């Protein structure tokens, strides 16, 4: 894989967007531009989901924390995903309260009910790397901009960008 010029650009301070672009799976980078990473408001819902899934895959296959790529890309993935998911969900979020784990647990039952527990949702660091990756991909699959006047939106989706970042962080420190 050829590296692009070393330039840090975009709204997430310290994130090298060119390195991020180069780190994404080709199934993602072949279908987006560098500008798509820097300006989430310009891309479709499907492209946002594609980028988020690419970031989860990039986090899952992270280098050692001593690798320069970890410092320029991977450690910034939680903030980047927070921003992208916020755009996907409509831009409004609530940083001051926690996600309703019980409500979120119910939402996950059709897809992850065979293994997900409330304990795992409260303590994502206790999950294996593949479990975290599966949960994050399911959040992306379920995410969409919806009316802000629903109870589910208030209890779960309004708070999801922060929760997503919290769940993604332990993935960056797991050996897979």
Swiss-Prot record:
InterPro entries: Major_non-capsid_tenuivirus. The keyword Isomerase does not apply. One of its GO terms (cellular component) is host cell cytoplasm. Its main location: host cell. It is found in: Host cytoplasm. Keywords: Host cytoplasm. Belongs to the tenuiviruses NCP family. Induces the formation of large intracellular inclusion body, organized in amorphous and crystalline arrays. Presumably the main cause of the stripe disease observed in host. This is Major non-capsid protein.
